[in-house]
Amino acid sequence: MTGGHLEVLQWARANGCPWDEETCKYAAEGGHLEVLQWARANGCPWNEFTTSAALYGGHFEVLQWARANGCPWNEFTTSAALYGGHLEVLQWARANGCPWDDRTCANAAKCGHFEMLQWARANGCPWNEFTTSAALYGGHFEVLQWARAHGCPWNEFTTAP
């Protein structure tokens, strides 16, 4: 449903086509709020990948609607927020109770989102050697230097990406 063609989905469902959580996920990733709303109103299941897909696709309005309507989220949601590079979205997710883990810092480093990494660390987000590996893999020397200067660990795998 990344194409966002509501009438096609409606026709498919009226003619017995099955659906699952992927329908909501792809509608969210494509930013097709009307499709997502119709799917949910008609019993389509969703899961935490719907919220992650909304953020991965950069669709903050879709995320807000999904959360307001009970869609679950998890640590992958904050990781997905990093790909869009929108600090205010990450801040909103955290302020609204979205969990995070060391992948959040690693994804910020990989994408070169220095400000997001700094904010995450200043707000207690964990990190590990995957953060330094991701910075090196992404070619973000400034991020790597900052992470090391602030105590981020590394190991022999840091230079192996």
Q: What residue ranges belong to the model's regions?
A:
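Ankyrin repeat (ANK) tandem alpha-helical domains that serve as protein-protein interaction scaffolds
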Residues: 1-161
